[in-house]
């Protein structure tokens, strides 16, 4: 299982493998494979499409 990957800007945020740790804790990636979706901690890491 790959670790959580970081999401960049607010608009069109996507997941990246290169960044191991996120600068902002609220933005983290989905657990699903091949999913370039970002999640927010407030809603139990629910996935949102951008």
UniProtKB/Swiss-Prot annotation:
Recorded superkingdom: Eukaryota
This protein's record includes keyword Disulfide bond: yes
UniProt KW keywords: Chromosome, Developmental protein, Differentiation, Disulfide bond, DNA condensation, DNA-binding, Nucleosome core, Nucleus, Spermatogenesis
GO molecular function: DNA binding
Compartments, record wording: Nucleus; Chromosome
Entry annotated with the keyword Nucleus: yes
Listed GO CC annotations: nucleosome; nucleus
Major localisation: nucleus
A GO biological process held by the record: sperm DNA condensation
Tissue specificity comment: Testis.
Primary role: Protamines substitute for histones in the chromatin of sperm during the haploid phase of spermatogenesis. They compact sperm DNA into a highly condensed, stable and inactive complex.
Family named by the database record: Belongs to the protamine P1 family.
Subunit structure: Cross-linked by interchain disulfide bonds around the DNA-helix.
Protein name per UniProt: Sperm protamine P1
Annotated source species: Saimiri sciureus (Common squirrel monkey)
